[in-house]
Amino acid sequence: LQIALQTKIKLFYRPAAIKTRPNEVWQDQLILNKVSGGYRIENPTPYYVTVIGLGGSEKQAEEGEFETVMLSPRSEQTVNRNYNTPYLSYINDYGGRPVLSFICNGSRCSVKKEK
């Protein structure tokens, strides 16, 4: 009997100059720009963001097929998905998988702020 396991662990160091406060959600600064055939995800923050889902509903963002995207600080990446009301799922600092809801105004979509 032979069992093989493969595990990936990502470790990031945050310099003191960009440390966050506990429970601070900075991922809500992400911006989706509509482009031909999909979205360009823009990360204006000084942090890495791992996007694990993009869908037309919260459930689709959580469970749908999506190739994970790692966004570097102050970078952008294009994904070939197109939805009227996009939802984005990411991995937070605690391993959780929150979902962000976006509101689009023209070709620019920003996170819908919770009240």
UniProtKB/Swiss-Prot annotation:
Q: Which Gene3D superfamilies match?
A: Immunoglobulins
- Which Pfam families does the entry mention? PapD_C
> Quick check: keyword Chaperone in the entry?
yes
What's a single GO CC term here? periplasmic space
Q: Where in the cell is it found?
A: Periplasm
The superkingdom of the source organism is Bacteria
Keywords, alphabetical: Chaperone, Fimbrium biogenesis, Immunoglobulin domain, Periplasm
By sequence similarity, the record places it as follows: Belongs to the periplasmic pilus chaperone family.
The UniProt function text for this chain reads: Mediates assembly of pili by forming soluble multimeric complexes with pili subunits as an intermediate step in the assembly process.
Q: What is this protein called?
A: Chaperone protein PrsD
